[in-house]
Each structure stands twice: as C-alpha cells, then as structure tokens.
Amino acid sequence: MAEHRFEDFNGLVMYRKNYKEKDMLVKILTDRFGKKMFYLRGANKPKFRLSAAILPFTQAEYGGDIRDDGLSFLNNVKSATQFQTISQDLFLNAYATYILNLIDVGFPDSEPLGIWYDKVEQALNLIDEGFDAAMITHIIEIQLLQVFGVQPQLQGCAVCGRTDLAFDYSESYGGLLCQRHWHLDPNRFHSSQRAIYYLRLFSVIDLFKIQSVNVKEATQVELKMIIDRLYQDTVGLSLKSKQFIDKMYSFDSQLPQLKKVPSEIDSTPKDD
C-alpha cells in the first residue's frame, strides 16, 4: 500500500485535464515533492471551492495528501496568485507552457527538483513582469541541457581550454572551438561572436540577478537557431508547445492583433 502524508507545500500549476464527468487531474510542480498529479473530485462543478487555486499559471500555498505513488489529493489552499500577464497574453502563455513542458520531460515525477523549482518560478515571474519571454526561455533551455545529459562545453575551447580567443560552436566536439582550432570542424556553426557571447552568458547567468535584458533582434534570431539546433540534434525533443512557438515566430508579422507590446528589457550585459 502506497505511503501517504498530509503536507503543506508551495506549487505551480503545470497543467490540468478533465477526468470522468465532473472531476479533474491537476499536475503541480511542488517545491518539496517534485511534480505530482492531484485528483480533484468535483472540480468541474460550479462553485468548486478550490477553483481559483487550480487555474493554469497559478502559484499557491497548498495543503494536501501526498502519495508516494499514484495520485495525490489537495485539501486546502492558504493563498493563490495567478500570473496575470502570462494568462492574458497568447505569446507569453506559449513560452511559459514550453518552460513547464521542458521541466515535465526533464525530471521524473515525485522527485524534488531542488534549485530548479526556484528557477522555474523566477523565470515565470520575469516573463510576467515584462522581461523578454524568448530570452528568458533561452536561458532555461541552455541551463537545462545539463539535466538532459548533453551539457556542452561553453566555458572555453573544447580542445585546448583557452578562453581569450574568438569562438564557434562544434557539435562534433561537444562545445566551443577557439579560433585556432576552427579548422578541425568545417561543419561548425559559423556563428557570430555576439551570439556565442550570449550563448555562454546564458549558460551561467543567475535568473535572480537579472535586472534587464537587451539583445538585438538579429542576435535573437541567431540564438534561436543555435539553441533549436542543439535541442534537435542532441536532446531530440519535439514538444507541441515548441512547435506552437515556432509557428508564432514564423507568422508573427501576419498576426499584428496578437503581438505583444515590446517589453522593457535593457540588458545585463548591454548588446552594443
């Protein structure tokens, strides 16, 4: 018989789905127990008492019956707040969903995530406050590569370790090559130094110390191409939320009514 205990915990609603006629399954990223699926009987009934606490993109202090195996159960909520900006903006919604999907795929259920719970919470806070959703998502993507077991060498040259020369990315060498060793891989990415700079920066930047971000559009486009290629070739993920972002990215100019007002993100380092 599975062990269970009544616990208080903080959590972020990852997603929810209807179950049977009037019930619901809600997956919550918790600060203490990792990702847990909760069964809420009667959640689809009118005036369900926990309705506000199980909305998408909600963070709350919960109390519940935590089961080691199988479904857990929510009993009460002490406080709940929703990421309002994310909830009301299709673009931000897509990026936040993608971040949560990456976490769902990257970590087993019922295992504490440690610092990653705080990272995800802070990433959503930054996006909700108006920081560039694509750049915050790229930071998460790059730092998650280690979780997926494919962390590239981004601190120095993968061959000689030098850190003071121009760099390019090499899939064959699993990281950066300094200019002296570019000849070793004719299929290197041929990336700009500005894009490589941000790739390296995003791999170590502390989300809690970001005050602003300002990356030129051309660099953003190149960064997206680099990170997409890393995920396609080394991680091998094909998430629906990422496909949706790519479609938005491609057809952004055709959807002016959905475009977000440019965010106020000046950068922690400036992109001169």
Swiss-Prot record:
Matching Pfam families: RecO_C, RecO_N
Organism domain of life: Bacteria
InterPro entries (UniProt xref): ARFGAP/RecO (IPR037278), DNA_rep/recomb_RecO_N (IPR022572), NA-bd_OB-fold (IPR012340), RecO (IPR003717), RecO_C (IPR042242)
GO cellular component, as recorded: bacterial nucleoid
Keywords per UniProt: DNA damage, DNA recombination, DNA repair
GO biological process: DNA recombination; double-strand break repair
Family note: Belongs to the RecO family.
Function noted in UniProt: Involved in DNA repair and RecF pathway recombination.
Record's protein name: DNA repair protein RecO
Organism whose genome encodes this protein: Latilactobacillus sakei subsp. sakei (strain 23K)
Lineage: Bacteria, Bacillati, Bacillota, Bacilli, Lactobacillales
